[in-house]
């Protein structure tokens, strides 16, 4: 629900009200309804745009939610120029003097103004978001609607006020519109009955619009003006009955309406609520009407109680003060009831919007509360983690502090030990001073000896270099001898292989010779046989004759014998030839045997010579190696002696290194 705040409005016109700009006033519940243009300015076009953000005002006067100020639905009414206050008014186009104000209305106006100012000084009332239920126990503060901003009334099936009243009746306020209900009919009647009953009621507001302020109509004024009777061409006005009695009417065809009084402000009227403004204006105007009627006395006539009469009623007697006051109070009561009904209707109309806004605001507060709660929880967790981290750091720093204290104590102990040791070393240094001088003299002597030994060492190194060069030359000679030995050994192996081949050939020749001997024996035996046969056949041969037919018939034996004699001659020639070859082979074998034996003897001599040379080289190498080892041992011994002397001079002892000697034994190839 929206929080209602009212602003004070003085009854008397302020001197600066005509020049100072009017600040925008916060609208009431009914002023939130869009679509009602201001009568003071041009009617805005009807459009359904997105509603502006609603804002709420708490009792402390602070705006919550970060919403900006809402733009007013209607532009502010410019200040009206001050109208000179006159002491006369026009009622039914007749000049009337100013009627005396009603004492009861002035007292009530003053009391309501004081109550209104006291209410403005206090905190604004609280509205709960429940339909039709207002908060109780609010220190007895009445909840009243704020002044509505100038808007045009919505058409509700009845013609508007300017259609009845003409161009001069456009400035009627809510309180002046309520006079129509006061003099035209009861407020509780429906719109249909009021329109039908007021169809024949002529209205003539001649001097009314000129004396009215050019302010704005409140909600109750709009509702009152919407219930005006329609214009009728008939001359009679129906009389309506009210609970309090008859309402007077002035004239036979026109309603008498009083003019403005001296105390009415001429600027724009911003009342606290439609109810209070209409009550005050109705009371004051009622008193003035009563004064005007009593003053004139000739134009006032009561309405007829019969609604069906069309003829003008006779002029009534002048009404009394009590009747007028009773009518005024009844009009006030009807205005209050109408305003209360209007407020209830407006609250019912805006209930959904206000409840939705309140729920949205409540959800926004819940979201803010959840966000704040989460932020608080996160901050608490961060603070807890930071506290734990700080505690851990404090614990680590305490441990480091204890460790540093232990290290400091240990360093102090080490410092004391080092100080004691330094004192001991200083004492020993003072004691060893004379001995150091003696040691210096000995070192000088030893340095001279060392220089001599170094000179001897250089000489021995030169000899060693010479011996090394000789050793290198011997090694080169040894390599050459070994190469020659390898060559001679190769040659010997070749000769041995050749000798073996010759021996094999000799054996083969001997075997062949033996075979030839056996063949020769066989041939000898055959030759003996052939000799014997030849001896038997040495008879002189018969010279061949002419072909004897008897030779053709020679036997086979003769043919064999004659062939054997030819074969024996050929065999003898072959045997002789073989004998010559055998002798020649024997001579060649003997020559080869002699050459083989000579080569074997030469190879044996060369072998013995190489072996002797190799043994001599090996012996020389062994002697050189031994001499080198001996020289190395001497050099090492000298260096050890020098080092021992130096260490002895410095007062240190060192173990002598163990020297391992190798044994070299000669081997026979």
Curated annotation (Swiss-Prot):
Residue span of motif Nuclear export signal: 631-640
GO cellular component: centrosome; cytosol; microtubule; midbody; plasma membrane; vesicle
Keywords of the record: Cell cycle, Cell division, Coiled coil, Cytoplasm, Cytoskeleton, Microtubule, Mitosis, Phosphoprotein, Wnt signaling pathway
Compositional bias of kind Polar residues: 172-181, 215-233, 298-308
Effect of residue 638 to A: Induces nuclear accumulation. Impairs nuclear exclusion of beta-catenin
Chain ranges passing through the membrane: none
Tissue distribution of the protein: Highly expressed in prostate and testis, and at slightly lower levels in spleen, thymus, uterus, small intestine and colon.
Residue span of region Required for centrosomal localization: 1-332
Location of Phosphoserine modifications: 249, 296, 570
Chief localization: cytoplasm
Stretches for region Sufficient for interaction with CTNNB1: 447-669
Compositionally biased residues, Gly residues: 284-295
Localization terms from the record: Cytoplasm; Cytoplasm, Cytoskeleton, Microtubule organizing center, Centrosome
Compositional bias per record (Low complexity), positions renumbered to this chain: 1-25, 187-199, 241-251, 267-283
N-terminal signal peptide: none
PANTHER family reported for this sequence: ZIPPER PUTATIVE TUMOR SUPPRESSOR 2 HOMOLOG-LIKE PROTEIN-RELATED (PTHR19354), ZIPPER PUTATIVE TUMOR SUPPRESSOR 2-RELATED (PTHR19354:SF4)
Family: Belongs to the LZTS2 family.
Subunit description: Interacts with KATNB1. Also interacts with CTNNB1, gamma-tubulin and KIF23.
Name this polypeptide is given: Leucine zipper putative tumor suppressor 2
Native source organism of the sequence: Homo sapiens (Human)
Gene: LZTS2
